């Protein structure tokens, strides 16, 4: 029993010495999750698939990048802003984007029909 306790104490001391953090690398201090805007910054897109294999010398990275439609880009912008996202659940992304990001100024109110002079 006494030798078992000595072995456990020695094992704990060795574990503490081996697990000492040297501060040479701060990888353990990095965030586990990255923001959505940076999610694809370190991942390269697939070079091809069974339906469109890469041709030539493989320098077609820019040709195979998908170009997002303006509607998809607006929807992603709206998803990042929570009030716009909640409004979009009820009214759709197009209306939500127009409401929150549509124009820099508020639309001018038209004068009444009686006030118009032709």
Curated annotation (Swiss-Prot):
4-carboxyglutamate PTM sites in chain numbering: 21, 72, 76, 79
Q: Name one GO cellular component term.
A: extracellular region
Q: How is it modified after translation?
A: Requires vitamin K-dependent gamma-carboxylation for its function.
Q: Which UniProt keywords apply?
A: Chondrogenesis, Developmental protein, Differentiation, Disulfide bond, Gamma-carboxyglutamic acid, Osteogenesis, Phosphoprotein, Secreted, Signal
Quote the subcellular location field of this record. Secreted
Q: Which residues form the Gla domain?
A: 56-102
Check the record and name the SMART domains matching this protein: GLA (SM00069)
Instruction: Tell me which domain of life the UniProt entry assigns to the organism this sequence originates from.
Output: Eukaryota
Give me the disulphide-bonded residues.
78-84
Tell me which positions the record assigns to the signal sequence. Answer: 1-19
Tissues/organs with expression: Expressed in heart, calcified cartilage (branchial arches), vertebra, gills and kidney. Within the gills, MGP is found mainly in the proliferating chondrocytes and the pericellular cartilage matrix in the incipient calcified cartilage of branchial arches and filaments.
Q: Name one GO biological process term.
A: cartilage development
Q: What is its main location?
A: secreted
Sites of Phosphoserine modification: 22, 25-26, 28
Q: Name one GO molecular function term.
A: calcium ion binding
Described purpose of this protein according to its UniProt entry: Associates with the organic matrix of calcified cartilage.
Family stated for the protein in its record: Belongs to the osteocalcin/matrix Gla protein family.
- Please report the name of this protein according to its UniProt entry: Matrix Gla protein
Name of the gene this protein is made from = mgp
